């Protein structure tokens, strides 16, 4: 697991390239013993505009006050159902009440909350949206990626979400085409993300769709990801990973100049951005066949989501084997 010191080095290097928005995800970030300190330290760095968190919210209620004091800007809660029995079936633990308490605690603390729900054929879109509206939080429905169960359990997001909600609440407002209910430019996502947002009559919240397959947004994707062990993934749907913290970056040596460390990491980030492919390769069955898909959520959160792929392409920072795929465009859209 990355130390706070290493995380801060990565963030400092990223800000040098113009990257200003940072999100802590997982696994489960609330398990990190120094999460509050990490958020606070990141927020104090020059060039950082926002720090957000994505969590299953099981432990959120006990963390909200400290996160608020640390300066967290927003929290996304992963919640695929509000039915207690179905939640227990999905997670193997009866912890829906803990999640709801966490959401309520965050809202009471004045933290902006959004709900993320992964779509399956069983997803009760109307119930989840009603719950979000009651809480005053935006909700985003995320298309399941074709990994593991996603190969056979996915659904077409637009028809599943917009179709179901339209039957109950009428056509969404803020549309600009006759054939497809796309929101107007001024209602596009202000959160620098891939979601398309829709507004339904009588709702004071936005309903978002994130469609990696049916609404491919690769040409505007501005995300790169760092794993808990310091590897960098330019794209979730690619077999390319990069060594972000090479041996030349000695974090045990306090005498090593931070600027020198930042410079090495910044070069790795540049290489990763240049290596970001034009589009994902989820259609490549050979590349994305998981050897194992393990998931478990428990009260102590001792386990976390893990997917191991059969094929990966490792790019060492010291080798700088970046694939120059429209590098100028990538640097521009990500911040450099």
Locations of regions flagged by a protein language model:
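Radical SAM/AdoMet-radical enzyme domain recognition
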Residues: 1-24, 28-142
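Electropositive phosphate-/nucleotide-binding environments in soluble metabolic enzymes
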Residues: 4, 96, 155, 259, ...
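Well-ordered beta-strand scaffold positions
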Residues: 27, 58, 203-205, 231
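Flexible, glycine-rich phosphate/dinucleotide-binding loops
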Residues: 60, 122, 148, 216, ...
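Radical SAM enzyme [4Fe-4S]-AdoMet core and its adjacent flexible, acidic
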Residues: 80, 85-88, 93-208, 212, ...
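Radical SAM enzyme core and accessory elements
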Residues: 215-336
């Amino acid at each position: 697991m990355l130390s706070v010191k290493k995380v801060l080095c990565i963030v400092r290097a990223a800000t040098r390239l113009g990257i200003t928005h940072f999100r802590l995800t997982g696994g489960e970030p609330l398990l990190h013993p120094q999460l509050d300190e990490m958020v606070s330290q990141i927020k104090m760095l020059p060039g950082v505009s926002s720090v957000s968190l994505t969590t299953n919210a099981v432990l959120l209620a006990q963390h909200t006050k400290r996160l608020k004091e640390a300066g967290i800007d927003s929290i996304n809660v992963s919640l695929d159902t509000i039915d207690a029995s179905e939640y227990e079936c999905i997670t193997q633990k009866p912890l829906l009440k803990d999640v709801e308490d966490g959401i309520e605690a965050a809202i009471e603390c004045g933290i902006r909350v959004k709900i993320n729900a992964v779509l399956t054929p069983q997803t009760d879109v109307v119930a989840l949206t009603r719950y979000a509206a009651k809480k005053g939080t935006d909700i985003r429905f995320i298309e399941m990626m074709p990994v593991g169960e996603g190969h056979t359990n996915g659904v077409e997001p637009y028809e599943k979400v917009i179709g179901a909600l339209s039957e109950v609440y009428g056509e969404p407002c803020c549309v600009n085409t006759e054939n497809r209910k796309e929101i107007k430019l001024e209602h596009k996502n202000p959160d620098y993300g891939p979601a398309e947002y829709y507004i339904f009559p009588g709702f004071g919240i936005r309903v978002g769709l994130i469609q990696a397959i049916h609404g491919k947004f690769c040409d505007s994707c501005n995300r790169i990801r760092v794993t808990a062990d310091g590897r960098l993934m330019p794209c979730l749907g690619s077999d390319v990973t990069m060594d972000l913290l090479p041996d030349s970056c000695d974090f045990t040596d306090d005498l090593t100049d931070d600027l020198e460390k930042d410079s090495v990491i910044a070069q790795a980030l540049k290489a990763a951005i240049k290596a970001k492919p034009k589009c994902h390769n989820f259609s490549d069955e050979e590349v994305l066949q998981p050897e194992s898909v393990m998931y478990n959520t428990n009260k102590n959160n001792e386990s976390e989501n893990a997917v191991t792929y059969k094929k990966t392409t490792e790019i060492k920072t010291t080798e700088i084997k970046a694939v120059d795929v429209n590098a100028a465009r990538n640097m521009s859209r990500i911040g450099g």
